[in-house]
């Protein structure tokens, strides 16, 4: 699947190492390979954006290496491809040897996988399913400040799906564990690949059922009900959390404005 980059090769360049992206001038490199000193490097074509190929190059640059979060405000499709590149780069870096027999592995030529030529085992990129849910109570939405978010951002509740658990069960458990309340009328909304480090966010909306807010201090700094027209600092546009909040606000406006 990989190839040597030639002088006139052009497109979008995902240059990644250890979950970081090369972002010269704060942007994803776009244009001729020669302009970015990429000629002669090995590259994987991982998609297409605006009619041009998107290439993954497994390489560390001394300067301008940053987080994929820095491109979250770009188009959702390009952010998704950047996230794919970062996750694949880390997958290839961390799967050089077979976890069963210890022999060297090599990339598959037909799919995103690493193969062991000794025991013939096959490894795929790990994807961790998560739930994220906006909870509405009449004209208000439940928003929380997470321990890991010290920047004042308030967002909806989220968490990882456990082994042997359905998405619906995960929503009920996470909401109860983090806030102490029960929800009802759960509705699936959308999903978003989230490369921090390798999650797939499954987004839901739900209605408050019963209980009083009792936060888990290991997870949350605070949680409260906020009226739809008086909200605190929110997650940035482009995140599925922001989408859920905006959808909830729209529903409240339709009923209470």
Curated annotation (Swiss-Prot):
Domain spans labelled Nudix hydrolase: 125-248
Catalytic activity, EC: 3.6.1.-, 3.6.1.22
Cofactor(s) required, per the database record: Mg(2+); Mn(2+); Zn(2+)
Binding site for a divalent metal cation 1: 158, 178, 219
Residues annotated for a divalent metal cation 3 binding in this entry: 174, 178, 219
Summary of subunit composition and partner proteins: Homodimer.
PANTHER family, alphabetized: NAD-CAPPED RNA HYDROLASE NUDT12, NUDIX HYDROLASE, NUDC SUBFAMILY
The family this protein is said to belong to: Belongs to the Nudix hydrolase family. NudC subfamily.
Name of protein: NAD-capped RNA hydrolase NudC
């Amino acid at each position: 699947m990989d190839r040597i980059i030639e002088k006139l090769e052009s497109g979008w360049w995902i240059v990644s190492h250890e979950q970081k992206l090369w972002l010269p001038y704060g942007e994803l490199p776009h244009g001729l390979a020669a302009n970015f000193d990429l000629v002669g490097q090995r590259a994987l074509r991982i998609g297409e954006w605006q009619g041009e190929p998107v290439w993954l190059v497994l390489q560390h640059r001394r300067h301008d290496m940053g987080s994929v979060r820095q491109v979250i405000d770009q188009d959702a499709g390009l952010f998704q491809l950047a996230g794919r590149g970062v996750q694949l780069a880390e997958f290839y870096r961390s799967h050089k040897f077979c976890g069963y027999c210890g022999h060297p592995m090599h990339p598959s030529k037909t799919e995103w996988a690493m193969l062991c030529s000794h025991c013939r085992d096959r490894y795929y990129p790990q994807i961790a399913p998560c739930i994220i849910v906006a909870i509405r109570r009449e004209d208000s939405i439940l928003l929380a400040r997470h321990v890991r978010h010290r920047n004042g951002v308030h967002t909806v509740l989220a968490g990882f799906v456990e082994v042997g658990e359905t998405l619906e069960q995960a929503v009920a458990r996470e909401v109860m564990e983090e806030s102490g309340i029960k929800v009802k009328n759960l509705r699936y909304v959308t999903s978003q690949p989230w490369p921090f480090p390798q999650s797939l966010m499954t987004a839901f909306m739900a209605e408050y059922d019963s209980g009083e807010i009792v936060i888990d201090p290991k997870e949350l700094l605070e949680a409260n009900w906020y009226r739809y027209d008086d909200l605190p600092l929110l997650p940035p546009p482009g995140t599925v959390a922001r989408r859920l909040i905006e959808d909830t606000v729209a529903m409240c406006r339709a009923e209470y404005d």
